[in-house]
Amino acid sequence: MAMKRIFCLFALICFTVIITRAQTPQDSARWNPDEVIAFAQYDTLTLEMDCYFPNDDAEQHRCIIFSYGGGFVDNNQRQVSIRHFCRRLADDGFVVVASNYRLGLQGVRFKGPLRMIKPLENAIGMASEDLMKVTRYVLDYASELTVDPQQIILVGSSAGAIISLQCDYERCNRTDLALRYLPEGFRYAGVIAFSGAIFTRKGMKYTHDRPAPTLFFHGTADKLVTYKKFKLFNIGFYGSDAIVRQFKARHYPHKIIRFQDESHIVSIRYLANYEEVRWFIDKMVVDAHHYEIDETFFDPFRPKTQWDTIGPGEMY
């Protein structure tokens, strides 16, 4: 089922209050993780995952692995809004794992798109490997974590959205990276990407397996993570618009919400779009409805923010 709807928002004051409250919650000890587990060691660097558990006695739960954003430069794993988001999901019955990963672009200076290809590829590769290590840890200790191994959902923001999409892409293409960490026949139950993209040197195609049902959020004017694509011969960085074209052509289940003329600020709206996240999980993951939905959200009164002008040159 293909649907395309255009929404206009006129209640500017109400919208601003809701967004502000959703994105800047007051800190609370209740939002701290229930358990912190080390899952990887690189020399002096220890990577940890923060676990949030539901307050019930069920033996199995659906699991969400959340990957933070930060341009592969900053560690925002325990940012207040992320802890709030994770705790809210746990309160709704999910085991939530907020994962850390290596930051491959720390210290890298931006010298133009072409010179960033290799550093970006390395950063995505390292972080994707770490996310797969987290996945494997959750699978290996599913019983102890009370996780249903067939119900693992990836959720990511910005850089975290990139590696969430990348991991499922690697799985679908049975790459060496995926075969090294993911067991044969494993499939993510779903992917949710707030301003994500996929990197490939072989042109974008799903060669072996179907991608998991995927929910995309992306601003059409995003200057940090491309909304469309950056391509040089077979090397490409494919944003949500380009990925969805592939999904549509092959009728893979998906939903995309395009934020017309909006920037990378969309990447931090996981709390503001919580109901959309829950709808996707309930309808397209749990109930396994096959939807192909394309929505455009347009706010003619949207206030300008610093995200509107930030590009790679200001980030690196």
Residue ranges of predicted features:
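Cap/lid segment of the alpha/beta-hydrolase catalytic domain
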Residues: 76-77, 100-125
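C-terminal catalytic histidine-bearing segment of alpha/beta-hydrolase fold enzymes
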Residues: 248-316
